[in-house]
């Protein structure tokens, strides 16, 4: 959610036959905004497998993870005053961690400093707001998502068969 109540969400192709080919998939895998007044808008329609989504702390940048096996990356978009987005770009290339078509950058959260804690095969990447890799949390498993705990400084990380918990020195921007 954006602070004004607008809901931004992705509609990935997961669960459809032929996820990463053209057979049996929905015509658009996109990023949408459901405004607080109920209007639904397709904002981005050129991402093959949009997945995780989050805002920078100042809400001027929208981040989206793309699990496309040919372009696994976290993407960044400028958020305009009217809530639409522009100037999409690769924020961080995650191809080095792609293991197979179903494991690329996945769910993520942004901390109060604007750093991304992003799930990916083998662990979590911590990426600064300028796109620099700050570090990694290696788990050896394909990670699926992260969430902040109630205290805002505990990071929960999910994998296929495990849940990890780690206290971090930074903290949640929002829950």
PLM features: what roles do these ranges have?
Residues 1-7, 14-15, 25-30, 40-61, ...:
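Beta-rich, blade/repeat-based domains predominating
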Residues 12-14, 67-69, 79, 121, ...:
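Short loop/turn segments immediately following the C-termini of beta-strands
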Residues 24-29, 71-73, 85:
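A detector of repeated loop/turn-to-beta-strand junctions in beta-rich toroidal repeat architectures
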Residues 29-32, 73-75, 123-125, 162:
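A short loop-to-beta-strand structural motif that recurs across blades of beta-propeller domains
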Residues 36-38, 81, 130-132, 170:
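Short coil turn/linker residues within repeat-based beta-strand modules
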Residues 41-45, 84-93, 135-139, 175:
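Beta-propeller fold detector
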Residues 76-85, 167-175:
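Short loop/turn segments immediately following beta-strands, especially the blade-tip
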Residues 145-175:
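Blade-level signature of beta-propeller repeat domains, shared across WD40, Kelch, NHL, RCC1
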């Amino acid at each position: 959610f954006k602070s004004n109540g607008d809901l931004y969400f992705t509609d990935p192709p997961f669960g459809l036959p032929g996820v990463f080919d053209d057979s049996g998939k929905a015509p658009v895998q996109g990023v949408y905004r459901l405004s607080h007044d109920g209007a639904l808008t397709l904002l981005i329609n050129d991402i093959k497998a949009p997945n995780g989504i989050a805002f920078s702390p100042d809400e001027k940048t929208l981040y989206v993870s793309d699990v496309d096996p040919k372009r696994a990356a976290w993407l960044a978009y400028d958020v305009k005053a009217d809530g639409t987005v522009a100037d999409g770009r690769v924020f961080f290339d995650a191809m080095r961690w792609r293991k197979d078509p179903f494991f690329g950058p996945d769910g993520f959260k942004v901390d109060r400093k604007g750093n991304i804690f992003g799930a990916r095969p083998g662990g979590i990447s911590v990426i600064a707001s300028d796109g620099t890799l700050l570090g990694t949390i290696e788990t050896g498993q394909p990670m699926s998502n992260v969430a902040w705990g109630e205290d805002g400084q505990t990071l929960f990380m999910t994998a296929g068969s495990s849940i990890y918990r780690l206290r971090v020195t930074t903290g949640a921007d929002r829950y």
